[in-house]
Regions:
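Short acidic, Pro/Gly- and aromatic-enriched capping/linker segments at domain boundaries
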Residues: 85-105, 340
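Active-site and adjacent substrate-binding regions of carbohydrate-active enzymes
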Residues: 160, 191, 206, 212, ...
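Aromatic-lined carbohydrate-binding/catalytic grooves of carbohydrate-active enzymes
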Residues: 144-281, 294
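Terminal connector regions
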Residues: 118-150
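Short Pro-Gly-centered flexible turn/kink motifs
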Residues: 102-121
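Polysaccharide-binding surfaces and accessory modules of carbohydrate-active proteins
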Residues: 1-82, 98-100
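Glycan-recognition surfaces
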Residues: 238-277, 321-385
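Conserved mixed alpha/beta catalytic, RNA-binding, or beta-rich assembly cores of soluble enzyme
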Residues: 81, 95, 122-124
Length: 385
């Protein structure tokens, strides 16, 4: 998007923060020069949401002019306003140009992410209502778009990695007594996952913990009158996993350099179709065999060493964008095959809380901060778009 405005008499508003402090409202007055937000993390990020608003100095919740711009994209982005020597303001929004190249052969085309532009004469409330109505009816889609969402209980903060099948069933039983409708099993149910150092990428049940497998556990949960949900982190892998031992070249890594990890995990190369196909196959098999009504899709680290062994050196500038296209492809295939499963997007809380995700997952994890008072600023900022 590129938009010119004839003056600079605006306040810039952005939604910024950090983990557990996502989307705090930040305001500043536009002056000559460049005001910008961006992400180079491989996701839209906790630090800056891909949204900005320009509002007149007298604009409040219900009166005054406001212009909102929201980027429908989940990867690296940049949004900026530049005031020139004539006090003309130019707004641009799109893929972050830093580190980005895309090679086009003759006859080929490239599709850029879409941006949504909203103009309001009825203040910030008029702007936010327009965004929300548009996204609720024209961007979100599928079986769950217009349905009330189930009240859920997630075991993570009750057990972390320390659970057994019997303990999970007991938690679910008590949750049912409290009016909960959906029980969600979080991290730790798969492979050799007894802590965060192993197992990612091996999406098969740990039979020592779950002797009846996910199928058996899901049936026991449903017998209590609850629906059953499951946590995945499809884009990541631990070195201590069968997947990594079989395919050490399937991660993003720069040749000749040490590959850094976050939470002891590495990023799978989702630019490669065979990698996405493999993860899809494991997830689809499990979803087909078990009574699963909900998926929490997590992403717990940023992308570093963004280099694909599959692409030639003159196409490495495409990796970040190709990666997020791979994520979208996996979402598209799973949501098409399992249309009645409720997908919730998550990235260490609200690290990928953007309209691009909303198209595939009609529910988003707002933040890992569940303190009622601390959430007030997060909820207020989130309500803007």
């Amino acid at each position: 998007l590129s938009l010119d405005l004839p003056d600079k008499d605006y306040e810039w508003m952005q939604l910024s923060g950090a983990w557990s402090r996502e989307r705090y409202i930040k305001n500043r007055t536009l002056e000559q020069g460049i005001t910008a937000i961006d992400s180079m993390r491989g996701n839209s990020s906790h630090e800056h949401n891909p949204f900005l608003a320009l509002k007149r100095h007298n604009t409040d919740e219900n009166a005054g002019e406001a212009i909102g711009i929201s980027l429908v994209y989940s990867g690296n982005f940049r949004m900026q306003a530049e005031v020139d020597t004539h006090d003309v303001t130019r707004i641009t929004a799109g893929i972050n140009p830093e580190g980005f190249d895309w090679k086009l052969e003759p006859g080929e085309s490239f599709q850029t992410p879409e941006a949504v532009l909203v103009y309001s004469e009825n203040g910030l409330n008029g702007m936010s209502q327009t965004f929300q109505k548009l996204y609720a009816k024209r961007l979100a889609r599928g079986y769950w778009r217009d349905k009330a969402r189930p009240i859920l209980n997630n075991n993570w903060e009750a057990t972390y990695f320390d659970f057994t099948e019997e303990r999970l069933v007991e938690i679910a039983r008590k949750a049912k007594e409290c009016g909960v409708e959906l029980f969600v099993l979080d991290d730790g149910w798969f492979g050799a996952r007894r802590n965060d150092r192993a197992g990612l990428g091996d999406w098969v049940a740990n039979e020592e913990l779950l002797p009846n497998g996910i199928k058996g556990l899901s049936e026991r949960i449903e017998a209590l009158g609850l629906k059953f949900g499951l946590w995945f982190e499809p884009e990541m892998v631990n070195k201590d996993s069968d997947l990594y031992r079989a395919h050490p070249d399937w991660i993003l890594q720069t040749p000749g350099r040490n590959t850094s990890h976050g939470r002891y995990q590495y990023v799978l190369d989702f630019t490669r179709k065979e990698v996405v196909d493999h993860i899809y196959g494991m997830m689809a098999k499990l979803l087909s065999e078990s009574k699963i009504s909900y998926i929490k899709w997590d992403m717990n680290r940023s992308i570093t060493e963004c280099y694909s062994n599959k692409l030639p050196s003159d196409r490495q500038g495409e990796v970040f964008h190709r990666y997020i296209l791979g994520v979208y492809d996996l979402y598209e295939r799973l949501t098409n095959e399992f249309p009645e499963i409720l997908f919730e997007s998550c990235a260490s809380g609200g690290g990928r809380f953007d309209p691009g995700m909303l198209y595939y997952a009609p529910q988003g994890w707002t933040s890992d901060d569940t303190d009622a008072i601390e959430r007030l600023k997060i909820q207020y900022g989130t309500s803007m778009v």
